[in-house]
Curated annotation (Swiss-Prot):
CDD domains: hydroxyacylglutathione_hydrolase_MBL-fold. It comes from Shewanella baltica (strain OS185). It catalyses: an S-(2-hydroxyacyl)glutathione + H2O = a 2-hydroxy carboxylate + glutathione + H(+). Its cofactor is Zn(2+). This is Hydroxyacylglutathione hydrolase. One of its GO terms (molecular function) is hydroxyacylglutathione hydrolase activity. The keyword Hydrolase applies. The lineage of its organism: Bacteria, Pseudomonadati, Pseudomonadota, Gammaproteobacteria, Alteromonadales. The gene is gloB. Thiolesterase that catalyzes the hydrolysis of S-D-lactoyl-glutathione to form glutathione and D-lactic acid. Pfam families: HAGH_C (PF16123), Lactamase_B (PF00753).
């Protein structure tokens, strides 16, 4: 059985721990902080076998060197092949190596190219779990620091095509702020209203809203629904000074991301 556990880091990061029972060797996804990972390993008598990186930002990679030293430089470190990240031992690209097997894990791990937040961002799928870094968030998506709106839209559409029951393990607890924006854009979405209430209740109890699911995100995430009639109408109303005669899905997505950046 694959167990996935969250380690909280910084203000709102999640470092995901993957453990295939009964093995005591584990992998971590995007360890921006080594100290919290080491504390978790030692408290649970686990051995770190490797690291999976989605992109180069320091809050996702900052712990790699210390974890490698802690493990006496025996770690396998997987990450995107076209981003400059210190310590990667196994550079990955979905076209060249779409699937591979991790030691101590059952089944294949799939690599997806999902540029947008950064130019070389990748995501991982193992079993029914998606680790998407800062590409897809619950109720939102990552800012476009390096990629284009077209790249991000394509990446999100690729993720939205995964099986509906796929669990979405993003890297940040941004859900409430994302849902506040989503409700401004899509106020009559009952599924969104219900999810917002559940998310508020979870956060009041200091519980994570993650993982989400692909099915839920298809229903409530405005960035997966940029061509929805109510969302299009909201975009046109918000950007009323623009000519919307030929507003296609990419144009709507671009304006939606611009709106969120300044929300």
């Amino acid at each position: 059985m694959l167990t996935i556990t969250a380690i909280k880091a910084f203000n709102d990061n999640y470092i995901w721990v993957l453990q295939q029972q009964p093995h005591t060797q584990v992998y971590v996804v995007d360890p921006g902080d080594a100290s919290v990972v080491i504390d978790y390993l030692e408290a649970n008598k686990l051995t770190l076998a490797g690291i999976l990186l989605t992109h180069h930002h320091n809050d996702h990679t900052g712990g790699v060197a210390e974890l490698q030293a802690y493990s006496q430089n025996r770690l396998s470190v997987y990450g995107p092949d076209n981003e400059k990240i210190e310590g990667i031992t196994h550079p990955l690209h979905a076209t060249a190596q779409p699937r591979f097997i991790l030691d101590y894990m059952s089944g294949e791990l799939q690599v997806l190219d999902v540029p947008g937040h950064t130019a070389g961002h990748i995501a991982y799928v193992i079993a029914d779990a998606l680790f998407c870094g800062d590409t897809l968030f619950s109720g939102g998506c990552g800012r476009l620091f390096e990629g284009t709106p077209a790249q991000m839209l394509n990446s999100l559409q690729q993720l939205a095509q995964l099986p509906a029951d796929t669990r979405v393990y993003c890297a940040h607890e941004y859900t409430l702020s994302n849902l506040k924006f989503a409700l401004a854009v899509n106020p009559n979405n009952r599924a969104l209203q219900d999810y917002n209430e559940r998310a508020i209740a979870l956060r009041r109890q200091e519980k994570a809203t993650i993982p989400s699911t692909i099915a839920l995100e298809r229903a409530i995430n405005p960035f997966l629904r940029a061509s929805d009639t109510e969302i299009v109408d909201s975009i046109k109303q918000h950007f009323s000074d623009l000519n919307h005669a030929n507003l296609d899905e990419l144009g709507g997505f671009t304006l939606l991301r611009q709106w969120k950046d300044n929300f």
